[in-house]
Regions:
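Mid-to-C-terminal catalytic subdomains of enzymes
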Residues: 152, 158-202, 206-211
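Short, low-order "capping/linker" segments at domain edges
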Residues: 288-302
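A short interface-forming secondary-structure element
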Residues: 242, 246-259
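ATP-dependent adenylation/nucleotidyltransferase module used to activate substrates
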Residues: 1-163, 218-220, 226, 232-233, ...
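C-terminal boundary motif of the adenylate-forming
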Residues: 208-218, 281-283
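A conserved acidic, glycine/proline-rich C-terminal tail/linker
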Residues: 255-270
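Generic alpha-helical secondary structure
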Residues: 8, 104, 191-195, 259, ...
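Residues at alpha-helix caps and immediate loop-helix transition turns in enzyme cores, especially N-
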Residues: 60-61, 173, 258-262
Length: 302
């Protein structure tokens, strides 16, 4: 057996020792793999719980539910309330801590009520190099990270996911929509809807590694009505900030945006969504670009 296969057997043994397990599920590479293996080992003694809030794209939620149905593991949707927490919406560099704290705070009573011995989430061995406030919340709630505990890296999880036939094996890295808003700028459901719609425009044109970073340009002192913002946008008011979209694509995909009129199409569609300005980041997509300028990385590079 190769090293990844050895670790998979260690994971199965570890999960079996739990007896029962509640998995924090998102539909991403790591949590799909964890939920699939946990169900293989524990059967009906496991449950995947997905947190639904404005920070989760609707397509991601639907895809996560479809994967669970396809592979036969049970899933529960939890409506989380992080947007009621001013510590979260203020969008500090440790925003992920407050998100994960809310999630684990909701998972704990569910685990107790349905007698799951362990709560687990999908942190892996490749995550150890970052400052990860979410991991601090996990430690506070005694949430286990079995992928990390057996030393599985992201590359190995992708390899094993392919062997198990999971459609997420080559899924691009994902992160919550709130990660598109620069630290210190308030996170709101309205902003996240704009980001979500803008990224759909690009994904529907065939782009895979996509981030639309949401910035706000301040109007002059006495305010300027933004005539470019769609009439039905909540941002179309005098004295408001002017929303700017900074598009990040994989460097190899940037030439595709410049071809066949796609650049004009994207600009037009994003202005319909409500962006006053649409820009392209010439450095391309890179994880954690919102962290640039910070002394430490954030907890969820996106």
């Amino acid at each position: 057996m190769n090293l990844a296969s050895d670790k998979l057997e260690q994971l199965r043994t570890l999960l079996g020792g739990y007896g029962s397990c509640l998995v924090a599920y998102s539909g991403g590479v790591d949590s799909v793999f964890l939920a699939r293996v946990a169900h293989e080992v524990l059967g009906d003694r496991t449950l995947a719980a997905i947190a639904d809030s404005p920070s989760l794209p609707r397509r991601e939620l639907q895809e996560a539910l479809e994967i669970a149905a396809r592979f036969g593991f049970p899933v529960r949707i939890l409506q989380t309330r992080e947007f009621a927490n001013e510590n979260y919406t203020a969008n500090p560099a440790n925003r992920c801590y407050f998100c994960k704290h809310e999630l684990f705070e909701d998972l704990r009573p569910l685990a107790r009520a349905e007698k799951f011995a362990v709560i687990a989430y999908g942190e892996n061995a490749s995550d150890t190099g970052d400052f990860r406030p979410g991991a601090l919340a996990a430690a506070e709630f005694q949430v286990r990270a079995p992928l990390k505990e057996v030393g599985l890296t992201k590359a190995e999880i992708r390899e094993l996911s392919a062997q198990l036939g999971l459609p997420t094996a080559d899924k691009p890295q994902m992160a919550c929509l709130s990660s598109r808003v620069p630290y210190g700028e308030t996170v709101t459901p309205a902003k996240l809807r704009m980001i979500e719609q803008a990224e759909y425009v690009l994904r529907d044109l065939g782009f895979r590694d996509v981030r639309v970073r949401h910035h706000e340009m301040r109007s002059p002192e006495f305010g300027v009505r933004n005539e470019n913002v769609a009439a039905n946008s909540t941002l179309r008011t005098p004295h408001s900030a002017l929303p700017l979209a900074r598009i990040e694509l994989a460097p190899v995909e940037i030439p595709l945006l410049l071809a066949n009129g796609k650049l004009a199409t994207v600009a037009e569609e994003l202005k319909k969504i409500g962006y006053a300005h649409v820009t392209l980041d010439l450095q391309g997509y890179r994880r954690g670009s919102t962290n640039e300028g910070l002394s430490v990385a954030s907890g969820n590079p996106a």
